Amino acid sequence: MSKPITAIIVGAGHRALIYAELAITNPELLKIVGVADPNPVRREMCMKKFGFSKEMCFTSAQELAKHGKLADTVINGTMDHQHLETAIPLLDTGYDMLLEKPFAPNEEEMREIVACAKKNNSKVMICHVLRYTPFYYGIKERIVSGEIGDIINIQTVENVSYHHLSTSYIRGKWANSKECHTSMLLAKCCHDIDIMMWLMSETKPTQIASFGSKYQFKPENAPVNAGTRCLVDCPLVDECRYSAKRLYIDQPERWAFYVWDKLEHIENPTIEDKINLLKGDSPYGKCIYKCDNDVVDHQSVLVNFESGATGTHNLVGGNSASLRRIHITGTKGEIYGNFEESKFYVSKIHPTTTDEKIVEEVDLKVTGDMVGAYGGHGGGDERLAADFVSFVRGEKPSLACTSIFDSVAGHLCVYLADKSRENGGMPQKVIL
């Protein structure tokens, strides 16, 4: 039996720790041997959880790189705009890498990281976790089998629930593009555009156009008597659907890893601790209409492919529930379904039947957290981490494996979609 690969966590945030959980559930595959993070609380937590010494705790990727190669790989879960400054020194030191998506905030940094990986012959895998869910993996298998023929059109939709949108993209880390260096489309939908590129891998994108705006969450749309902080001066605290009390105090476990991160130094924070945090300077206590958000809350993308096929992706935020929907039309049939229902349908042309078609329901029977509110993504997270081990070992990875080179098309399409949106929908040429 092969020894587990060794890994150091760089950026001990929510996503990196989810992938590192494989070392707990499957210690024969992965062993966490160190951490690099500026937060002493997180360094201490990782040291205790994974059982390594204080000598393997570092304050930054740069400090880690100065010590030479101390493990087989790193799990890079730093913020999007930190990927260049953390990835380059570690790849140059000889580490292979599991790198969170989006792996770069713009085309220039994307190409620089790709060039570094190529120069060092590094094995770099991007965390496109939705590829690993039974839903999308199952659809990919049916397309590869040729059941629906050549793809003519692919339509994807992502509805972002009101509580996810408000927590992550209005009040949270990805609300302001100047601070997080990431657009809404890149932060939320590089998943979806990657899925489109993966399912259309027999051809290449050639042109992109896009429209979108910040439509709903701005000061002029606030109720007349709304305050500035929900728990401090707002008379609507008990009735507003975006009230910090209703979203975070009444539902303290939902998105807890974002909302309560400033309380992580307290072992068991009380409700009073949480109320005081939201009353203070926490962005999660702000009126939803009076934040410093500048990202869009809806956007549509149109893609033209070399084969003549077309694709569309629609992002809409503020819905009653999260939803990912897909509909693929081929020359012999269609595949369509909703990710949250964990089932899809294969509808094939059949002129001799009464309905002139044959429809097969594929029920994957996956339950649990499908949107990541508690960390899960329909089972994709653990499968991705295990596939990374196979990738690093040089074993044959799964159909879903996304090397950094496979991820370029999806990222580039997002950058160009945003450029098109910023220029009134002007089509952009895709040069891979």
What are these regions (language model features)?
Residues 76, 99, 105, 124-126, ...:
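Hydrophobic residues in well-ordered beta-strands that form the structural core
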Residues 1-52, 196:
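N-terminal Rossmann-like dinucleotide-binding module
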Residues 13, 52-116:
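Beta-loop-alpha module in the N-terminal Rossmann-like domain of NAD(P)-dependent dehydrogenases
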Residues 50, 295-432:
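C-terminal helical cap and adjacent loop that interface with cofactors, partners, or active-site loops
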Residues 130-286, 424:
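Predominantly a Rossmann-like dinucleotide-binding segment in NAD(P)-dependent oxidoreductases
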Residues 112-129, 149-153:
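Rossmann-fold dehydrogenase core element
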